[in-house]
Amino acid sequence: MSYMTPQEIVHELDKHIIGQDTAKRAVAIALRNRWRRQQVDEPLRHEITPKNILMIGPTGVGKTEIARRLARLANAPFIKIEATKFTEVGYVGRDVDSIIRDLVESAIKQAREREIRKNQPLAEDRAEERILDALLPPARDLGFEASPSEESNATRQKFRKKLREGELDDKEIEIEVAMAQTSMEIFAPPGMEELTSQIQGMFQNMGSGKRKMRKLRIREARKLLTEEEAARLVNDEELKLGAVQNVEQNGIVFLDEIDKITSRSEVSGSDVSRQGVQRDLLPLVEGTTISTKYGMIRTDHILFIASGAFHLAKPSDLIPELQGRFPIRVELESLSAEDFKQILTNTDACLIRQYQALLKTEGIELNFSEDAIGRLAEIAFSVNERTENIGARRLHTVMEKLLEDISFNATRYGGSTHVIDAVYVDERLGKLSQSEDLARYVL
């Protein structure tokens, strides 16, 4: 779980997302409140529930990016799902309970990776010993000596030195390793995902523990044995118990495209199923108990962050009960030309830096002048204004079109330097951006 202060969280988000200060502050406070709650004594701690957030804003302004970055900062069980994937219980499709099952699976995978990283040094030592045993099989104990001879120890140390220096990487050895588990795909009716996963687990357990001899190069054997030893050092029971508790206390669910399951009075037909999904979400967001193969999971303290563009619908089109479960509402603003300029240059992995790094692999040096960056921002902004507003995603299309010739002929231009200025931008994009029909289909 993250111990960062709200200011530190916003500072980290600022490295990747331009603007949207209100949304950043809201998610920063929500994340910090997770830590604050843990410091409160029982029984009051149990009564403090998370205040769920609804982010409203057009596409391409940073809603999903905030979720992606929050997942990395949170260091807590996190899952991002699309609301449109789910259907009302009884219809063909996934039911909303699978959100929590997926969250638990994600938490267990995260915990296992963390444990494996922690055990990596010990696992590498054990793998090294197994390789040395294969290279120098220990002498049989005949009862005459209490310990291995000094000569065999010296030989082992020589081989250990060669092994660490990589001199034996291409040598082939025969080792005993665990057999790879064959995955079995089982197709089940909707709503039976839990049963399906249990059957798959049963078949996997039947094949576990089997071992076989394999001939491998030491380079490959070291990697395989390290993974095997690291997995062996993990206590699965403790890991699962810890992951379940972590989900219940610190889990975060990001529910994207929630506006697509709203029901509008002038539209009928599919609205029945949409309302059904909303009603199925209600107990999940309010707090209920979900059965998973790792045990019962209570959702009372899981934080839900929902987002949607709400172009064709309004937040008030959600059923009133669900509206009440998202007390914090944040409106994200459309991006200005200045925002586009900042996105191109001022984030840690800005688009210009990405394209410079990509073309540098071909020996091409790309330099962008200030007026070129300003012109690119103006073009992206004006095309968004005159056609569909797709936010910052427009910059990807504009940059691809701008650098199409250089990218295609990169091998011919190798070792050269290209200066991109406003004149070059207008040559490549001027006509396209001025013609609404061309801009609509090309940019």
From Swiss-Prot:
Main location: cytoplasm
Positions of region (Disordered): 142-162
Binding site for ATP: I18, G60, V61, G62, K63, T64, E65, D256, E321, R393
Cell compartments where the protein resides: Cytoplasm
SMART domains: AAA, ClpB_D2-small
InterPro entries, per database record: AAA+_ATPase, ATP-dep_Clp_protease_ClpX, ATPase_AAA_core, Clp_ATPase_C, HslU, P-loop_NTPase
Protein's name in the database: ATP-dependent protease ATPase subunit HslU
Gene Ontology annotations of biological process type: protein unfolding; proteolysis involved in protein catabolic process
Assembly, per entry: A double ring-shaped homohexamer of HslV is capped on each side by a ring-shaped HslU homohexamer. The assembly of the HslU/HslV complex is dependent on binding of ATP.
Gene name linked to the record: hslU
Keyword annotations from UniProtKB, A to Z: ATP-binding, Chaperone, Cytoplasm, Nucleotide-binding
